[in-house]
Amino acid sequence: RLLGKDPKKKRRTLFQRIGVQFQEGDYQKEIKVSELCKETASLYRSPADWRALCEQFGIGDKAKVAVKSLSGGERQRLFIVLALIPQPELVFLDELTTGLDAKARRGVWKTLEGLKEQGLTIFLTSHFMDEVEALCDEICILKKGTPVFCGTVEQAEKQCGCQRFEDAYLQLSDEEADA
């Protein structure tokens, strides 16, 4: 269930309440940022102001630029904007800050913390443990698609007897053994 609804039966209702940011996006070669944002906004009943979101994520000056011409970090921030256009109650973010420099990563984190404080639920997939520590209230560690730990960062560290979350993650996921 998502937001108390069966996704198989209430797909259209949930579509209006959920945002998704994919790690990679494949769009028309020449589509401009503004065109993609307008097209995305047209799918929702009450979309957010895409221009304001672009400004908030530091790509406000890129509206007339073709998506293919954006840097990797700019493209990643655009994908976050697209996920937030529906003004979702729940957003799925896949490898959120891949391709962002340290300053841009921190800026995205700060913005997401603000959205979280306003009640947005964020479901984050990440291989950056510092990002998980900074953003996640609850975590679920998977090993070959199966949950091996669910709880808080602190609980993971305690369970493994580790001082650092990254060490607990490696132990729980057996990634260190696979290397």
Describe the role of every protein-language-model region:
Residues 38, 42, 47-62:
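Conserved ABC ATPase "signature" region
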Residues 66-70:
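Conserved ABC ATPase signature
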Residues 80:
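Hydrophobic anchor residue at the start of the ABC signature
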Residues 91-94:
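Catalytic Walker B motif of ABC-type/P-loop ATPase nucleotide-binding domains
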Residues 132-134:
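A short, surface-exposed alpha-helical micro-motif characterized by mixed small hydrophobic
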Residues 150-151:
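ABC ATPase "signature
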